């Protein structure tokens, strides 16, 4: 006797659609707390796979406020800058290093395996969340890694800040560091603030000390890409020394005229040794996303 099942067949597309419907229904039936626990578990497994013993120093994806929210990109960003520190900046294991805008440790992680006990790493940031996170994870394991929050005003990142950037003196003595790093800091600062910070960098650097600072630089090439719509950032609002993506909140992202930046360096006595242009504006040949300016204190 036939049950009529011989004609009930599914093609691959139908089977796939049915499977997706079942999975969608299953997800709807799982309570939210269980979903969150599963997500945390999978996230921790992924961290362990990517970072090994350093996994406790890596924030959750939703905590990565200082760049792309992806574990793979967090790892890639850190490794990329670590190579730049060594190959371009000549960073040695026993140096005194200042990281202005240290974030949540994106560029700090590889340094824990490179800087020795004679080295000193000082990081500061306007974001208290990142500073507290790094203090808890890094400083407890590596006593020569220090982090502090600076209560400096920034319209985008710290609108309630107590001090104006032009008033803030870095909390270090003159010639305290042989290497200073600023990643994606001057891309969020107005001209007067940038000039003051650059002077402070010069002050805290030793003679012959180096600094690496990232920018969005305006020159003939980048302007051509911007005006043709190829740039990843729509720097449409033009001012005397810079362009920005927002007239109301220019600190959201600022690109400076390369010539103006070069003049600031010359005026202070910072000799630009190398300039590597980034991919941000749509150029095809680049080293990193932002433009990198490497200079030495004369």
Predicted region positions:
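Conserved beta-strand/loop positions that form the S-adenosyl-L-methionine
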Residues: 100
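Helix-capping/helix-break motifs at membrane-protein junctions
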Residues: 190-191
